[in-house]
Amino acid sequence: PVGYRISTYAVDPKRLAAFTPEAVLKACVSSDVPLYPFIANSAGEDGFDYAPAMAALCARDYVDIEKASCSFDSDSFKAQLQLLELQEAAKAESFPCNGLFYYDVIADAGTVAYRAERYLLPPMEQYVFCGYPSDHANGSVLHFSELFAINANSKQKSGAWAFLSYLLTQPCQESMQLRLPVNDSVLHAQLAGQLKKETITQHEIDLFYQLVDGLRVADYPTDPVEQIIREELAPYLAGDATEDETADKVQSRVYLYLQEQYQ
């Protein structure tokens, strides 16, 4: 990789002490006013569709690829289903609505700190990055902008390596736009510049690096499992399948897929 972005969520730590699906669900349903898991984004008539983000995270969190097993029949995944159902009601609300999590994309040094005004939302006095609700340390998602590899049978390995080396040089990394450089010394220099201009604080830089340190990457190709989850979410959100039925169906289909591919 030569660059990356991070999709995450910011939350006021005073409003939520834990970021597991069960904790988020409890906070939403016990609120005196309608409280949705996420701030609804303006993205067409249907609002922002959180199903793909939920499917991507769950394909990572509820699969043990070493054992070729999964836990979609767990209370945690069922809480994920309930959160997504709650969020569906937010689509009918005017923008913005009352939500716990604020979606954020970190694409360069200038967006390392969360700024609610970028999304036309009221500011938070304080925030932490928590990612999508997860039983693990962080539910944020790492997106590589480009991935390069050298073919083992290539007869031009030296030239290919020279090109890859150039992509990691300071001048090339400094010129990247809408992505964070993988060359950490370049990123440090960019953040130091932001700090000098007082557009960011050291605390906000520390929060960013805590986020980076907590990122998890899926250890298998998750697309087939994500597809299964999305297919079973459709009847659930349409009211044609119960929470237990959906969880059992996803568990059965994903387990069969894992046994066929990885056992």
Spans of features found by a protein language model:
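Periplasmic solute-binding protein
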Residues: P1-K26, Y36-K67, L142-I150, P224-A234
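Short amphipathic alpha-helical coupling segments at ligand-binding clamshell hinges
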Residues: A79-Q80, K155-L167, T246
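Long, aromatic- and glycine/proline-rich binding clefts that accommodate carbohydrate-like moieties
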Residues: Q177-P235
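Conserved N-terminal structural module of periplasmic/extracytoplasmic solute-binding proteins
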Residues: D244-E245, R253-Q263
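Periplasmic-binding protein-like
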Residues: V33, L164-H188
